[in-house]
Structure formats: structure tokens, C-alpha cells
């Protein structure tokens, strides 16, 4: 009976037939073929003096022995006379196809590959064959350690590839299209698409691939298949790498940290993009005006300003925008949605850029320094604007009158003088203004008029108190909620003699002041700390001559001040040289003032 080979029992598909199978069918095919291969491997083993049941349960061990036999056969045919190292257990994996890059084969070793059955399951063991004695290799510690994600590697080439992934270095370029890659193997895989020699060709675009896995991944672009689904939010992705990066938005993991400013990122692409900001590198240039950008996406958005191609149009106001992010931010202006909230002060924003700019106010971070004067700024745009004060550059010019400006925002504001646009409208009277400063000045005038008329539009729903302006009303509301947003960072400061909460001090206006003469005899709304000051009027003033000798109702601190009349004053001319009957009040007050 002839021996059974793997090709006799294997089921082979053509490229067209394979493309018709779905994911579950392809997975089932692989499992069946692997199981068949394991069974054939175990049948081809010599069973003399061995436990058959044990050997059947360990097909990997059988496969290893079979490969050793093949290697020994090839070893006998080699011409250099060297001995070779067998493949260790941990390197024999059915799905492992990578060879160890550290071991070099002999020049006269003409083995090529060890083929077992179908080429789909062939294993390249050239990398695991070395010029050493016939003994097992001990795979010890991993000497190459990557500093950024704290990952260790056994071989230096793998370490260098990982290192380039962080630094963004891509020394290998495609000669046809100029695209750069981290490794030589990536260039070779890429060149297959240009040559069209790959065994797997895409039906939709004609691209060729040398690997079935890459072909199937590429196919998802055309079919729209997204097998990788996020369990937390349900969002699906075409690629597992994109899915892994998305999962970090839920976990908050940011493994790529830039050492210069300490900012961390979810993906290496975001890390490299941020690195270009610090380096000042702008590799992507507009072909029409020559303006350079750090990211190719920004170039595409900028090119729409030349072609006047606005893809996104607002249905409410008709305004057209060139980018999706700008359009989404604009829509929030109409809806009032502000999804980005500051955790420190509670202020919310409609765009992520505005939110990030605001965050730097709390952190005090100013990573951008002017090289000429040393002044630091929290944003790169602020630094660029400041540098123009040194150079005198005014790149933004008005097309109608020719006037030039340092920033685009100043040019937009100036353009309203020509168009007559007045975007800032008063909510109370409907009057419109060209500048926001004019609107604020107008609102202050309206508040001032109400003070004279006595009108109080803003009333508290809890206590019914009325206010002239909305800001005073908002401050008052915090007294009911107990909200205190502003906290003193220096906790070692000596407290005042009379500790008064900030919300009580806000009520110290002239109309409710206990010092005012018109409020004499009226009950004060302030706390007990100021109850003693109600009596500080002219008729009960302890410093007045008419009150000399009368008992004071002030606290113990001011008891010694009762004797401070003109006739008994130690500063009076008639009392010069006379011993004062006052205690050391001033020494006490002087020392208290310094503390």
C-alpha cells in the first residue's frame, strides 16, 4: 500500500473560489487542514517501543521529530562538513513563519526550505539552523529593551524596527512612488503592488498582493466589511490595529509620550505628528501657493481653499466649510451643544481645540518660547503672532483696501467695515454691533441705567432677591448652592482677624453697608462678625467727644479705644510729658498688623 501524502487528502481552492468563502468558512477550512496535517504527521512516525496514545495526543512533538529527520538528511548532503543545531521546542509552531534573524546559514548549505505537504503549511527553518554543536539552545534573557513602551526583544533587528516605530524613522523608500517604510521587508511587500506579480489580485482595483492575509484585509476597503467591533461602544473597524487604538480612548491609555513636553498620545501617528510641531518640520507643501504643513490631511483641507471646493454645507445658515471637524464645530453653534467640559472650573466648549487651549490656563503650561526675547506662550499660534512683532511681518492683507494685519482674526474683523456685518447682537434691545467690545460696553450702559431707575430684572427663585445685571445674579445663586470654584493654593497664609467668607463680602455694596449713615438702626444681613460694626455711626462713635465716658458696646478689642478723646489723647499738646493711662494698645495693634 502506497503511503498517503498530504496533497492526496488536502482540499485546494482556486483564487476565485477562495474569494467566495466567508470568514467562518475560511476559518473552518484552516482548522480541518491543520487537523489533517497533524494526523498525517503522527501516522508517518515510527511507533516502535512507544506509547501510541501519548504520541497521538502530542502531534507537535511528532512534527518536530519529522523536521529533525529532514534536517539530518539535508545535513548529510551538505558540503561544508559542519554540524547543525536542531529546532528548539518553543520555535516549532504551525503558524510561525518567521525565521530567527540572528543566525547565518553556511554558504555551501544548499537546503533552501524544508517542505512538508502543501506549500501553505511549509515552514522555513533556515534561520534556526546554525553552525554549532548538536545541542539544544537555551533562550535566555532579552537584552534589547525599548525605552518608551518598556517592551523587550530577543533580537536586535526586531528592537531596531520597534525603535523606528516610535521615532518615526523610515530609511527605506520605494523607488517607484517614493513611499517610505521602516524595514526592507515592508518595501519588498510594497513593490509587489507596483509589479503586479503577486498571486492575489484585487478584482476591484487590480492591486496585487504576495500574501493572502494582506489581500483579505485590502478587500475590506471595497466590501465595507468591519469585523473588529468595540465591546464598549459598539463601533466597528476594518482593521485590528485601528480597533486597538480606539480601545485606548476608553481605557485612557496613552503609551506614546513625548519627552520634551511630556504630552502623551494614543497612536504612533499622533506622536509623530506632534513631534513635527516641536521640530518645526513641515514636509507637506501646497503645490499652488507653496504653504507647508505638518500633516498631509491639512494640505488636502488647505487645497480646497484654492479650488473653492466646500464639501460640507450648513442647512441652517447655508455656510460652506472645507473640513468635517470645522463643520461639526459650526453645527454646535446652532444647537448649543458643548460636549467638552473642563473638570476644574466646569466651563464647557464646542470644539476640542478651544478646550485644549483653555486647559493650559489652569496648568500654566507654556512650552513655546520666543528665541529673541525669551517670552513663553501656551500655544504655537500665540508664539507665531508674537514673533511677527519682532519681524514686522503682516501676511494677511485686505483685498479691498490693501491694509495688512498680523493675524487672520484681525483681518476678518477688519473685513466687517467693508461688508457692514454686525454679528454681535444685544439680547435685550436687539441692537447689533461690529465688535464684541462694543457689545460689552453697551451691556454695561444698560446695567448702569437700571441702577438709576431701580429696575431689577433678574430675580432669585429661592429667596426672591432682585439684581441689576446677570453676573451679580449668577454670583448670588452660588450662595444657595454652596459652590466655591476658586480655592487659594497657598494654605499657609495667616487668616484675617475677622474671617469673612467671600460670598458674604460680595454683598458689601453701598446700599447695604453697615457703615453707611442711612442704614443706622436697620438689621444687618451680614454674619455676627459684623454685628458689632452696626453701632459705628457718628452718634455712638467712641472717638467722638460727646461719647466720652459712656460705655461702649463694641467687643473687647476696642475697649481701650474708648478713652481716645482730645483731652486724654497721648498725642495731644497738653499731655506731652504726662504718663499715659492707656495700656500698650498700639503695641498690641502694631504686632497684630505684622502677623
Curated annotation (Swiss-Prot):
Residues 4-86 form the KRAB domain. One of its GO terms (biological process) is regulation of transcription by RNA polymerase II. Signal peptide: none annotated. The keyword Repeat applies. InterPro entries: KRAB, KRAB_dom_sf, Znf_C2H2_sf, Znf_C2H2_type. One of its GO terms (molecular function) is zinc ion binding. GO terms for cellular component: nucleus. May be involved in transcriptional regulation. Belongs to the krueppel C2H2-type zinc-finger protein family. This is Zinc finger protein 440.
